[in-house]
Design a protein with these regions (language model features):
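Surface-exposed binding/hinge segments that line
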Residues: 4, 96, 115, 134-181, ...
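N-terminal lobe/hinge region of extracytoplasmic solute-binding protein
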Residues: 31-88, 196
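Gly/Pro-rich hinge or "lid" segments in bacterial periplasmic/extracellular proteins
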Residues: 65-70, 171-227, 239, 346, ...
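Aromatic- and charge-enriched surface segment that lines or borders ligand/interaction sites
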Residues: 82-127, 156, 293-295
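Ligand-site clamp/hinge motif
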Residues: 189-192, 219-265
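Append "and occasionally in soluble cytosolic enzymes with long acidic Gly/Pro-rich linkers
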Residues: 213-218, 267, 295-392, 398, ...
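Extracytoplasmic/peripheral linker and loop segments enriched in polar/acidic and small residues
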Residues: 301, 313, 393-409, 437-509, ...
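Long beta-strand-rich cores associated with HINT superfamily self-processing modules
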Residues: 506-531
């Protein structure tokens, strides 16, 4: 397969301009996004954006272990060296902050800076409040009621209710430099072009929709995470074939999500394909609000039974795994549902007929989907395959195709928003790496959008009760058991159409000698090296 793109020549010029004339090591990375994610501290473009302009330029207080490949990571200290819940009031969490850390602009990381950043995204009366950053992270911090400085190296966060899962929320809270914000004239647009965090990379060049140049922060506080390359150039390339051809042409050195049917060609050209178990699910989030056809559980189950998931995996050339629920059966949160998700065309047709529809008298609906982007895999080909699959059972789907960030905005607004009139499913694929992200955000009735991202308005009091019980226990094994019970109920209710789990594939040129593919949607870009 040889596909030529005139765009590649222009890209080569812009990428080349970002490369130094010295002997510095430079790796050019083709990422599956239409633009560089927001660089001010809270990236946009979904969870995938965090690995590019989040955990590179900035740090969270609580971090995720991303530099291992043979097991799932765990929570580890970031800008907080420890965190603990108060013995007498379990709604209060104290975070001990790391000393001696500096922002890229040379200013000190302090408790005041942390409080300033909380205000930046949660306090719309604060002068530094940034609506754009707030939109990215507010729903990821649903438990935060208040926060306060205790002393120069300690802050306290009070949650709305007892929530043993709260530390997982802090993975998403990144810390920008207050001093740099002042220096650029209190303007977040100017800050985006010259940002300052505490992370392992510094942003040294940004050309929107073309590239972001990240330079190694040799003074980074975590010596184990000092980048293995001097410069990392991120190049947005939303189309899989564009990325693949750029890699084959030597215009980039690694890419995410190569075109699946080009894998044999990539391998024969000396490229290395790496992937791993990934907590991620490609799905349709169905509206169960009044007026939606998906209030009928028979139709929800029919969609799940109409899919030949092995064929979807084949479409991905093996770079995916069939999904039989929200999480993989290997997950501690996988329950024991009575509804068994499989390919059963006869049963799917039967359920559709019972609901009053057929191929001769089809149900018609509209789904909103992305034209591509990190996590969406082969968005259009997979959606078109499923469209045909559903047509076989008497369900005709039209697609409203939008850019990924538009889809995320729609996701946060929820199915009840007036902008979603006539749309009854959302196709955001997402991370399922922890109980918050696997279950709570999507199925707790108190997280119905726009409060959270329970897009479709799903409500089950039994699920809510299990989530509440899990939040109130600090015994990890008991938490797992309760979340698995909730998972069972959710799969039986089928508020989503679960299709496949991604394996997060990357293709590396022979130049790239080092890269740790973590069992996570986040990848640690400091592990990329040429020696």
């Amino acid at each position: 397969m040889h596909v030529r793109y005139p765009l590649l020549a222009a890209l080569a010029l812009s990428i080349g301009a970002a490369m130094p004339a010295t002997a510095e090591t430079v790796v050019r990375y083709g990422i599956s996004m239409a633009d560089v994610p927001l660089t001010t501290g809270q990236p946009d473009r979904g969870a995938g954006g965090y690995q590019f302009t989040g955990y590179t330029i900035y740090d969270p207080l609580v971090a995720w272990e991303m530099n291992i490949a043979d097991r799932p990571g765990k929570l580890v200290p970031g800008l907080a060296t420890e965190w603990k819940v108060d013995d007498t009031d379990k709604k209060k969490w104290r975070f001990t902050l790391r000393k001696g850390v500096k922002f890229h602009d040379g200013s000190d990381f302090t408790a005041d800076a942390v409080i300033w950043n909380f205000d930046k995204v949660l306090n719309d009366k604060a002068p530094q409040f940034d609506k754009r950053q707030s939109a990215q992270v507010k729903t990821r911090l649903p438990s935060v009621a208040s926060y306060a400085k205790i002393d120069d190296s300690t802050i306290e966060v009070t949650t709305k209710a007892v929530d043993s899962l709260f530390p997982y929320q802090m993975l998403w809270f990144l810390v920008s430099s207050p001093a740099q914000y002042e220096k650029v004239g209190k303007d977040w647009d100017k800050f985006a072009m010259s940002p300052s965090g505490t992370g392992p990379f510094k942003l040294t060049k940004l050309v929107p929709r073309e590239l972001a140049e990240l330079t190694k922060n040799a003074d980074y506080w975590d010596k184990a995470r000092i980048p293995k390359t001097d410069k990392l150039v991120l190049v947005p390339m939303p189309e899989a074939l564009t990325r693949t051809n750029a890699l084959l042409a030597g215009q980039v050195d690694l890419i995410e999500t190569p075109a699946p049917d080009a894998v044999p060609q990539l391998k024969s050209a000396g490229m290395k394909i790496v992937d791993n178990v990934t907590p991620h699910v490609w799905n349709y989030h169905l509206s169960v609000l009044p007026g939606s056809p998906w209030t009928d559980v028979r139709l929800r189950k029919a969609l799940n039974l109409a899919i030949d998931r092995d064929a979807v995996v084949a479409l991905m050339n093996g770079l995916a795994k069939p999904a039989i629920g929200q999480v993989d059966p290997s997950s501690p949160w996988f329950g024991k549902p009575t509804f068994k998700i499989k390919y059963d065309l006869a049963e799917a047709k039967k359920l559709v007929k019972e609901a009053g529809y057929s191929p001769e008298k089809p149900l018609k609906a509209t789904f909103i989907i992305a034209n591509g982007g990190t996590g969406q895999m082969l968005s259009l080909p997979i959606n078109e395959f499923l469209q045909q699959s559903f047509k076989e059972i008497g369900v005709e789907i039209d697609f409203k195709v939008v850019e990924l960030e538009v889809l995320y905005t729609a996701w946060r607004k929820g199915a009840a928003d007036e902008s979603m009139a006539g749309i009854t499913a959302n196709n955001i694929a997402y991370v399922t790496s922890d109980p918050l992200y696997a279950i709570v955000r999507f199925f707790d009735s108190r997280q119905v959008a726009p409060v959270g991202v329970n897009w479709g308005g799903y409500k089950n009091p039994k699920v809510d009760a299990l989530i509440d019980e899990a939040k109130q226990t600090f015994d990890a094994s008991k938490q797992d058991e309760l979340i698995a019970q909730a998972d069972s109920l959710i799969v039986d209710d089928a508020p989503l159409v679960w299709v496949v789990h991604d394996t997060n594939p990357h293709a590396l040129s022979p130049k790239v000698k080092k890269f740790v593919q973590a069992q996570h949607w986040f990848q640690d870009l400091t592990t990329i090296g040429t020696e």
